[in-house]
């Protein structure tokens, strides 16, 4: 932990997905002295590394910030727990491990909104490929297509970010693929080509049956570099600023707290905020960068009046549970002593079986309505069921079909509650507060029922256990969505990047805070609009892009 040396070229705040990649890339230049600050502990907790260990990391203060939302009007007054990774690797150490880029149109839209073509799909694809290590290119020829020419145009090999296929399959999920195909959702073997429409098994960020986090991929291999320093359990209290003779405001460092001791750290080049979509806006607001009205209400001196904390977007998921017959599900296995023993032994000796599972094994991307111009729904399908996350599985065979709106129009916010850095901010996603989001929720529930009613599923005699077929009208389904919908932990957008003249954008297209020198934000908070899928790998792409700009002096 801190010694007498508190001057560095680059200070990275947050040792999560983006921070780990940035630390790797910036320290690759020997002249750069890089400090990575992480509020959580080292990622030595054993459950981090076992895929099913997310069950013991989410909701655990050892690895989770333990946030909760405010009561949500769109969720009929319910509050949601809001997990965020608090350890090296950040959310990549506790998430669902699904490798998902989103759609090419997401990045074309970012380029349009920012006025900068370096955010388009072509440039984003190059950044994804730069750190990708895809199993389908391990032996040269792609085992699925028989060649690697077209696949290698879209994917990389030899990078740090390992992508593997899942290590087990389930008959009931294979049948769901067929049922979706009967509905017109085509099968796909690659959700990451730029058009993720289709149905198939997710690829995952694992290596040989272990979770492959950003810490393992990007940080551990380079921690011995003499120009890279990593401090854990280091809480950033505020950013520090000074005004030059020309009147320009510069961020010259940070004040951190470590075990009750305040330490000032100086950044000779840049401070890079990579604390995530909740903590990055909180740190900015506490430091005087944010909406003037909010800051003044807490007695904070305004450095820059800018909409930090606004534009919060998230994916909200509606979960349906179906009882099934005549097939094996995880419920069946875990409700017997023999089954549990088999699961443990299978992982111990083969690194396979249910302990190697991601939370969701199968996915589908499709339209909620034929009039939609592109896929706006993502399905997460599981051979298991439970009442709520963290509870025991049901004692009957069942499957869960969850579906989320990929392009919500509801917008929320993150706002500090006090001037204390240890006080959790107010998190208000404002779920289901637009007519369009409620319409998508209704359509998605009806679509789930149609898929489960296809011939391929009839052999399992599926019975809708939750929410129940008694809910049929638009009004009933809207109210139902408010009762049962839950976040799938993809908050983004709270420190928006955009065109230099956009008053709603906090950052310029190269992620520099407008109105301040020496300060950049690089994490999921910069997204002007949420990507059409899981958000962890897009966050790494953002960091890859930013690292290139920083190293080239842009």
Set out the residue ranges of the language-model regions.
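N-terminal redox-cofactor-binding region of secreted/periplasmic oxidoreductases
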Residues: 1-554
């Amino acid at each position: 932990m801190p010694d007498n040396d508190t001057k560095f070229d680059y200070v990275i705040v947050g040792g999560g997905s983006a921070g780990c990649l940035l630390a790797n890339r910036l320290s690759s230049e020997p002249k750069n002295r890089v400090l990575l600050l992480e509020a959580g502990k080292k990622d030595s907790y054993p459950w981090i590394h076992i895929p099913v260990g997310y069950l013991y990391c989410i909701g655990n203060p050892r690895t989770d910030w333990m946030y909760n939302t405010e009561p949500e009007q769109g969720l009929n007054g319910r509050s949601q727990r809001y997990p965020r990774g608090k350890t090296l690797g950040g959310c990549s150490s506790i998430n669902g491990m699904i490798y998902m880029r989103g759609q090419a149109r997401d990045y074309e839209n970012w380029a349009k909104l920012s006025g900068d073509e370096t955010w388009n799909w072509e440039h984003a694809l190059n950044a994804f490929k730069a750190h990708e290590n895809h199993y389908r290119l391990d032996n040269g020829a792609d085992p699925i297509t028989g060649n690697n020419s077209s696949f290698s145009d879209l994917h990389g090999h030899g990078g740090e970010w390992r992508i593997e296929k899942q290590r087990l399959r389930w008959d009931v999920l294979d049948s769901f693929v067929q049922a979706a195909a009967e509905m017109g959702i085509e099968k796909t073997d690659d959700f990451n080509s730029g058009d993720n429409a289709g149905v198939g098994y997710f690829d995952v960020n694992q290596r040989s049956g272990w979770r492959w986090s950003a810490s393992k991929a990007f940080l551990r291999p380079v921690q011995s570099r003499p120009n890279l320093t990593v401090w854990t359990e280091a809480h950033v209290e505020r950013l520090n600023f000074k005004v030059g003779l020309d009147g320009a405001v510069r961020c010259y460092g940070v004040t951190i707290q470590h075990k009750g001791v305040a330490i000032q750290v100086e950044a000779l080049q840049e401070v890079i905020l990579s604390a995530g979509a909740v903590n990055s806006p909180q740190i900015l607001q506490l430091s005087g960068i944010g909406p003037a009205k909010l800051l003044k209400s807490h007695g904070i001196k305004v450095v820059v009046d800018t909409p930090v904390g606004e534009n919060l977007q998230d994916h909200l998921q509606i979960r349906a549970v179906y009882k099934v017959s005549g097939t094996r599900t995880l419920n069946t296995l875990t409700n017997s002593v023999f089954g549990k023993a088999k699961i443990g032994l299978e992982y111990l000796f083969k690194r396979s079986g249910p302990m190697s599972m991601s939370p969701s094994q199968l996915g589908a991307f499709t339209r909620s309505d034929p009039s939609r111009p592109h896929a706006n729904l993502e399905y997460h399908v599981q051979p298991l069921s439970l009442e709520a996350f963290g509870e025991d599985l049901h004692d009957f065979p069942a499957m869960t079909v969850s579906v989320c709106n990929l392009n919500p129009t509801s917008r929320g916010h993150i706002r500090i509650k006090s001037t204390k850095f240890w006080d959790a901010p107010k998190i208000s996603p404002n779920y289901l507060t637009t007519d369009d989001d409620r319409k998508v929720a209704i359509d998605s529930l009806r679509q789930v029922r149609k898929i489960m009613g296809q011939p391929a599923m009839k052999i399992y005699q599926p019975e809708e256990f939750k929410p129940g077929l008694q809910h049929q009208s638009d009004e009933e389904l809207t109210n139902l969505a408010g009762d049962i919908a839950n976040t799938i932990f993809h908050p983004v957008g709270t420190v928006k990047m955009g065109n230099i003249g956009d008053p709603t954008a906090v950052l310029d297209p190269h992620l520099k805070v407008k109105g301040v020198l020496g300060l950049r934000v690089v994490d999921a908070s910069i997204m002007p609009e949420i990507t059409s899928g899981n958000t962890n790998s897009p966050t790494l792409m953002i960091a890859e892009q930013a690292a290139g700009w920083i190293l080239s002096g842009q």
